[in-house]
Amino acid sequence: MENCIEVKNITRHYPQFSLTNVSFNVPCGSVVGFIGENGAGKSTTIKAILGLLKDGEGSITVLGEDSRKLSPETKEKIGVVFDGLSFPENLTVKQLDKVMGGIYKTWDHEKFFGYIKKFELPLDKRFKTFSRGMVMRLSIAAALSHATELLVLDEPTSGLDPVMRSEILDIFLEFMQDESHSILISTHITSDLEHIADYICFIHKGSIVFTEERNEMLEKHRILKCTDDQLAAIDKSDIIGMRKGRFQNEVLTVNAAKYPDIPADAPTIEEIMVYYVKEQ
């Protein structure tokens, strides 16, 4: 199997939002970072991938199966972290362990409680008393505690302090030591992706802007630091987005080589996203 997720031309229409011909792949053995501003369509796309949105055009396969008709065996291989609490709020960690053990044949009690201890989560407090950071740590622990081959993560590090975020990213990297494992991670904390992502998929206003290998994307984009006169000399077709200042202008481009006399800096993933959105 070449791709563990294949999204082909999915279209979904809602009163104030649409996904339009969304297509991208998650190659097996890779981490794909799914980026876009709030409301761009990340969470809706993830719900479609998980078979939670039945209507609409296009097709999605997950681990070789139609996402709307996943077999119990395939569901065992998918770990999911939603952006928020996805378990009944009156449960405790101990109760959740029993519930999940009844759902997943491959549920690993020892591994689950190992993560719970690592994440310093209480065993007997109800989830409704948990902070957002605690909820995300709980969800990650559960997602990793069965025979998971594919992680689908919606804002998994949101609400976590920098130290815990770093620990979580290390856990994801450890998960990826197995070459059969794959991750699709949606996040607005794009700096996280600079540590773990192999590919970046950028969605804006319900449409895919690009899907590219991370290092290649970072290498080809440059931010030109230019005067007004230099800006006037730049071909408009070379300008992806720009920011005008009192003393200096910044232009995102993939054609910096055409302007050797203009200083150029390497952008971050966040800067690339911001400039694309500013232009559009």
Segments from the language model and where they lie:
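Conserved beta-strand
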Residues: 7-10, 17-27, 34, 58
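Catalytic Walker B motif of ABC-type/P-loop ATPase nucleotide-binding domains
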Residues: 151-155, 160
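ABC-family P-loop ATPase nucleotide-binding domains
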Residues: 76, 80-139
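Walker A (P-loop) phosphate-binding loop of ABC-type ATPase nucleotide-binding domains
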Residues: 37-41
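Conserved ABC transporter NBD signature motif
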Residues: 58-69, 73-74
